[in-house]
Amino acid sequence: MQELKKLPVGFENFQEIRKLDFYYVDKTKLVEQLLENWSKVNLFTRPRRFGKTLNMSMLKSFFEIGTDTALFDGLYISQNEELCKEYMGKYPVIFLSLKGVDGLTFEEARSALCELIAGEVRRFKFLLNSSRLDNDEKNIYRDLISLQGEQETTLATKLKFSLKKISELLYQHYGQKTIVLIDEYDVPLDKAFQHGYYREMVALIRGLFGEALKTNDFLQFAVLTGCLRVSKESIFTGF
């Protein structure tokens, strides 16, 4: 009798689930659907516990340069050999989950966002040794590793341009535009509403997303997931 696979209770990392041979509900058709109908910014809203984070992790594993292609063996998307050849493992990927961006004050929440972005930037430390980046660009990368401890205006500016800057540096290194994945984009806004600093957080997120997703020449496309469809007037104006 064939042994049943374990359920991935508490797991949201696609790579872990596949490598540990947990039971996986194949959602890789999402890759095909995304590439057939993609726009520059793609927003998916679903209820909580609907597998959004796992799907985003799967997208990261599919598109990111250096991916283990064996993770997709036997899954739906592997049948589309032409698509896999063209897109699998071909892009730098920035992946952020904003579900932990919270705080009783705006400053606390902003600090959490700064640390989250800096943590993702640290994944790309190879840029410090890149022959395709000059010293000024490497200094920009060093600044992005730590977004804390700056004066108010300097911090606000660095944070606003952080995702755009790191995508530019990745483009300089790889010669390929970046895919940006932002999971639970609405959590900081929901928490800000609860704690009374919604206007400040809307302004922060609008500025960050505006630079990273709207006026970014180094963006291939972006995927955002959340539970709330925040009004276009507040966040996605002009997208």
What annotation goes with each model-predicted range?
Residues 1-239:
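Phosphate-binding site recognition
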